[in-house]
């Protein structure tokens, strides 16, 4: 129930932000148009955003014939987690990463890059997929997929605001500075809304993944290895669609300094420390 409340709050917050931007661009008429668009986007996000995200990454569905070891691993972990078997996808990218998507456990999918399968051992890969299945089990995937879709729409609308500026109901330009301000601040606001939920969700998925696999040290080792390898390998698709970054097990976007303040993922060092403490104590709390 709590995850449905979080989903509703997220959709309401992003819808409100969408309407504010619409009002800045076109006054009351712009707010009305933005509301209609936002409602349509929320409907679309719920039913189709998983397919859109998988298409963005050109993910290819695999089965036990085309990727036997990986597919069997996901099936075994799904059974341990008490989940239906999700659809399994591979993404032809060198950057090591993985994510889960879908509106509920019955309509879930997990995806991994070919790079992560090359970099990680089988034990480490089990830790990663257990983490993703924890997202599925706790229905985080609906939240992350919707927020990724809506954040992308906010960025597009903010760019529109910068180009056309602020206008009244008659279409007259009123305050060009306001348009620039919206274009700069709206994506930040959208990122903060995502970040408010995403960081805590990653810690919870680490804990849940450790419970599913029974091996928190494997996930800790995987996170350390992904962190070290990913920094030197570009992930162009993720860079083109930055709103989807929070779906990944590790933030795929390059950059540091101020950019890290708005990261949707907690610090890798802290995640590893928590997992190693679980391994030491045997307590998954």
Curated annotation (Swiss-Prot):
EC primary class: hydrolase
Cofactor: Zn(2+)
Biological process per Gene Ontology, one example term: proteolysis
Cell location: Cell inner membrane
Transmembrane segments: 7-27, 30-50, 141-161, 177-197
Chain positions recorded as Zn(2+) binding sites: 131, 135, 202
Pfam families: Peptidase_M48
NCBIfam families referenced in this protein's UniProt entry, alphabetically: PRK01345.1 (NF002363), PRK03001.1 (NF002826)
Name listed for the protein in its UniProt record: Protease HtpX homolog
Protein species of origin: Paraburkholderia phytofirmans (strain DSM 17436 / LMG 22146 / PsJN)
């Amino acid at each position: 129930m709590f995850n449905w409340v979080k989903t509703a709050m997220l959709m309401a917050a992003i819808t409100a932000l969408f309407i504010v931007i619409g009002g800045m661009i076109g006054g009351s008429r712009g707010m009305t148009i933005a509301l209609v668009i936002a409602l349509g986007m929320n409907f679309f996000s719920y039913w189709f955003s998983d397919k859109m995200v998988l298409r963005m990454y050109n993910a290819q569905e695999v089965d036990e014939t085309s990727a036997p070891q990986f597919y069997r691993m996901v099936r075994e972990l799904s059974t341990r987690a008490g989940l239906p078997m999700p659809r399994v996808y591979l993404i032809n990218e060198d950057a090591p990463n993985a994510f889960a998507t879908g509106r509920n456990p019955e309509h879930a999918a997990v995806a991994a890059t070919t790079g992560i399968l090359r970099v990680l051992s089988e034990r480490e890969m089990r830790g990663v997929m257990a983490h993703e299945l924890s997202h599925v089990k706790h229905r985080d995937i609906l939240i992350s997929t919707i927020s990724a879709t809506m954040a992308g729409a906010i960025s597009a609308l903010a760019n529109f605001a910068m180009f056309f500026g602020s206008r009244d109901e008659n279409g007259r330009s009123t305050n060009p500075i306001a348009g620039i301000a919206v274009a700069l601040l709206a994506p930040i606001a959208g990122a903060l809304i995502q970040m408010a939920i995403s960081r805590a969700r990653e810690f919870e998925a680490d804990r849940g993944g450790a419970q599913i696999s029974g091996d928190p040290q494997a996930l800790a080792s995987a996170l350390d290895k992904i962190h070290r390898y990913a920094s030197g390998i570009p992930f162009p698709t993720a860079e083109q669609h930055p709103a989807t970054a929070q779906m990944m097990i590790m933030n795929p976007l390059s950059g540091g300094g101020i950019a890290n303040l708005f990261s949707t993922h907690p610090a890798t060092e802290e995640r590893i420390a928590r997992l190693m403490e679980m391994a030491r104590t045997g307590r998954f709390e």
